[in-house]
Amino acid sequence: MLVIKEFQFNPFSENTYVISDSETGECAIIDAGCYYADEQDILSGYIIDNNLKVKYLLATHLHLDHNFGDRHVYNTFNVGLTAHPDDAFLLDNMKEQASMFGIQLQDPPIPIDHNVHENDIFKIGKYSLRAIHVPGHSPGSIIYYCKEEKIAFGGDVLFRGSIGRTDLPGG
């Protein structure tokens, strides 16, 4: 069975997902937005308590609220960041993005370890997430679609009750 655990993290109430195969314990983290230490503990605690093996750290896009926890995931689970290269410029100015919202970043963001492109497949046990490139909210926005469960993870491409924002840099 595909298990989907949702967390709301950081001052922006960003959604972070841990997607796992209950049989193999393999999982992916989508949009590690955990900013505060207690949020990081909640995320890693869930993964450790459920004996999950993190295979992927997937970013739907590289706006800061979706990536505050990338370094924590990398340091804790030794998994690099997977994101679309069209969003790489956002990593270069993440400190400036944060200061616009009165947020301090302790460390620079981790770089993209694996570039994701249209139709790339990410296997989690017997399940597959297919990458669909949907520029608009950001140039590198990605939806991860699981055909077997008919579910999509799209970051800020859609908001509840509206379309996602397209007025941000690169949108």
Residue ranges of each PLM-predicted region?
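Accessory terminal helices/loops
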Residues: 1-5, 78, 166-171
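Conserved beta-strand hairpin/beta-sheet module of binuclear metal-dependent hydrolase folds
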Residues: 1-50, 143-155
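Short Pro/Gly-enriched beta-strand edge/turn motifs at strand-loop
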Residues: 1-3, 100-104, 125-129
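Conserved beta-strand positions that form and line the central face of beta-propeller blades
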Residues: 6, 18, 29, 90, ...
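Short Gly/Pro-enriched turn/cap motifs at secondary-structure boundaries
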Residues: 7-9, 105, 111-113, 133-135
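Metallo-beta-lactamase
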Residues: 25, 34-35, 97, 121, ...
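Short catalytic-loop micro-motif centered on adjacent basic/acidic residues
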Residues: 28-31, 56-59, 131-133
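Active-site HxH/HxHxD metal-binding segment of metal-dependent hydrolases
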Residues: 34-123
